[in-house]
């Protein structure tokens, strides 16, 4: 027999762990043309897993776009507290990335065919708890962003993710992970893990546009956090044995402005300016020298929470904030040229 999610202790029971999601139903697929019998498990994320009856190993998976299987087992009082879900696009590959059947896993979806491409586990974790134990608090992927593709590349070179969990073993868990595209394995491989990149959570993550053909200087990464800091991260290298070189990411700079909380960050199209939405202001910084170039504010915005460059060559900057208002500045004249509210 195949048992999943049943307490151990009875003779004759065999287990197939980590199928990916809670089991909804089971069926038996009879063998044909001298093939062995298989078990078919329909999972709560919408996928179907075939398990060989002799080896009890999964042989293949059929899946469309997966749904969040944790909703089916989460307590009712948690359904209303749904946080924003990460959503990103690798435009070079034509892939949309969103949460998969488990909060610690993302799925890649082909935007042209609207079909499931593959899953990628960002943080290894147990999917299902024992019946006599409390439901596990999963590590959740909070943010996913991609760098711009290098010249003639079919995929973004870098992917950054933020994952975490409230009240982990001893304290809140939070990790910034940098993944690099590996053309041999056709997937992203973990390059750098940075625990607690900010002391009080991460509010935004953004890659710069491509700044150089040199891989070491091609990109910067900007993050903002609940600790009031704006940080930039860069690629570094070190020599290994055998004349090999390893690339990794480290913190390049950290700065703040008037103890205001930064909510969002945006890069100018040419990478020459870094805009930060924080409190009453949108501040503009030179990312190389960290000298503030301008401070934009208007009485119409009480708290700016989002900003981005727009227009030809990023001449204009759009900002949204409370009370539900969109404002656009001309950066040449540093004046408001358009404003609209809900």
What annotation goes with each model-predicted range?
Residues 36-37, 93-95, 155-157, 212, ...:
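Short coil/turn segments that connect the beta-strands within blades of beta-propeller domains
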Residues 16-20, 63-64, 77-80, 134-136, ...:
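Surface loop/turn motifs at the tips and blade-to-blade linkers of beta-strand repeat domains
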Residues 1, 39-43, 97-101, 160-161, ...:
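Conserved beta-strand element within WD40/beta-propeller blades
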Residues 20-31, 70-89, 138-147, 199-210, ...:
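Canonical WD40 repeat/beta-propeller blade segments in eukaryotic WD-repeat proteins
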Residues 1-5, 48-53, 106-111, 170-181, ...:
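WD40-repeat beta-propellers
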Residues 9-15, 59-61, 117-119, 187-192, ...:
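A structural motif specific to WD40 beta-propellers
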Residues 64-76, 120-134, 192-199, 248-254:
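Surface-exposed loop and turn segments in beta-propeller and other repeat-based domains
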Residues 2-7, 53-59, 113-117, 180-186, ...:
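Short loop/turn segments immediately following beta-strands, especially the blade-tip
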């Amino acid at each position: 027999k195949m048992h999943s999610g049943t307490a151990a202790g009875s003779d004759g029971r065999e287990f197939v762990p980590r199928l990916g999601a809670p089991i909804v139903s089971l069926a038996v697929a009879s063998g044909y043309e001298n093939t062995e019998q298989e078990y078919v498990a329909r999972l709560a994320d919408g996928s179907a897993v075939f398990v060989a009856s002799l080896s009890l190993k999964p042989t293949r998976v059929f899946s469309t776009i997966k749904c969040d299987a944790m909703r089916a087992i989460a307590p009712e009082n948690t359904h209303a507290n749904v946080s924003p879900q990460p959503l990103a696009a690798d435009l070079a590959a034509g892939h949309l990335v969103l949460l998969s059947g488990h909060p610690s896993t993302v799925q890649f979806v082909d935007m042209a065919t609207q079909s499931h491409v593959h899953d990628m586990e960002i943080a290894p974790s147990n999917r299902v708890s024992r019946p006599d134990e409390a439901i596990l608090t999963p590590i959740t992927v909070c943010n996913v962003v991609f760098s711009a593709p290098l010249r003639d590349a079919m995929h973004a070179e870098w992917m950054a993710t933020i994952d975490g969990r409230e009240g982990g073993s001893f304290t809140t868990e939070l990790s910034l992970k940098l993944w690099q595209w590996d053309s041999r394995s056709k997937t992203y491989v973990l390059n750098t893990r940075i625990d607690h990149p900010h002391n009080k959570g991460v509010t935004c993550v953004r890659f710069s546009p491509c700044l150089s053909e040199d891989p070491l200087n091609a990109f910067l990464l900007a993050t903002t956090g609940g600790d009031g800091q704006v940080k930039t991260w860069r690629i570094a290298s070190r020599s290994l044995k055998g004349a090999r070189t390893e690339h990794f990411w480290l913190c390049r700079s950290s700065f703040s402005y008037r103890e205001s909380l930064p909510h969002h960050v945006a890069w100018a199209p040419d990478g020459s300016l870094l805009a930060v939405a924080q409190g009453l202001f949108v501040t503009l910084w030179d990312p190389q020298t960290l000298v503030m170039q301008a401070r934009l504010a208007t009485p119409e915005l009480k708290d700016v929470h989002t900003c981005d460059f727009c227009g030809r060559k990023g001449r204009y900057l759009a900002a949204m904030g409370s009370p539900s208002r969109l404002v656009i500045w001309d950066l040449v004249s540093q004046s408001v040229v358009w404003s609209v509210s809900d």
